[in-house]
Amino acid sequence: MQTEHVILLNAQGVPTGTLEKYAAHTADTLLHLAFSSWLFNAKGQLLVTRRALSKKAWPGMWTNSVCGHPQLGESNEEAVIRRCRYELGVEITPPESIYPDFRYRATDPNGIVENEVCPVFAARTTSALQINDDEVMDYQWCDLAAVLRGIDATPWAFSPWMVMQATNREARKRLSAFTQLK
């Protein structure tokens, strides 16, 4: 995969430039655009992934299905599709917005900061996973209700962005709609 960049944003969320992705994530990470996606299978189960140990931020942490950064000229939805192909090897239904104004800042145990305007999406797949080991070290298809109970009981076991997204009432409601079989 070619070198990725992040789109830097000012406090109002207006793009101000770009920076190479790896260089952007430091103890002083500037505000930038990202996305987060929750992927469901034909049985209505959620894909929960464990970040590879080689990841700069939150290595080895359980999180929602796919996260990433849109590139210049790419929509958030196109970025979700691209990263699902790259990280999971799957085709997905068109991503649906479930938490469009999500924004957060969090510091991992190594001091790396995430500082993102991060719209949240959900999608479905019927494809078999072809996991990219550089991105994902483990995964589980899970009942959404069980994952939400786990987040409520042990939030420290999940990425902070997943916890914040899952504890938003409207996002939970929209995620629950994806557990219904179509």
UniProtKB/Swiss-Prot annotation:
What note does UniProt attach to the cofactor annotation? Answer: Binds 1 Mg(2+) ion per subunit. The magnesium ion binds only when substrate is bound.
Q: Where is the Nudix hydrolase domain?
A: 30-164
Q: What PROSITE patterns does the database record attribute to this sequence?
A: NUDIX
Task: Give the subcellular location.
Answer: Cytoplasm
| Residues annotated to bind Mn(2+) | 25, 32, 69, 114, 116
Family annotation (SUPFAM superfamilies) = Nudix (SSF55811)
| Residues annotated as binding Mg(2+) | 87
Query: Which Gene Ontology terms cover its molecular function?
Result: isopentenyl-diphosphate delta-isomerase activity; metal ion binding
| The keyword Cytoplasm appears for this protein | yes
**Which residues constitute the signal peptide according to the record?**
none
Please give the name of this protein: Isopentenyl-diphosphate Delta-isomerase
Q: Pathway membership of this protein?
A: Isoprenoid biosynthesis; dimethylallyl diphosphate biosynthesis; dimethylallyl diphosphate from isopentenyl diphosphate: step 1/1
The UniProt record lists the keyword Magnesium = yes
Which cofactors, by name?
Mg(2+); Mn(2+)
Q: What is its EC number?
A: 5.3.3.2
Q: Where is the catalytic site?
A: 67, 116
* Gene Ontology cellular component terms for the protein in this record: cytoplasm
Question: Which CDD domains did the record assign?
Answer: NUDIX_IPP_Isomerase
Q: Which reaction does it catalyse?
A: isopentenyl diphosphate = dimethylallyl diphosphate
Keywords (A to Z) from UniProt: Cytoplasm, Isomerase, Isoprene biosynthesis, Magnesium, Manganese, Metal-binding
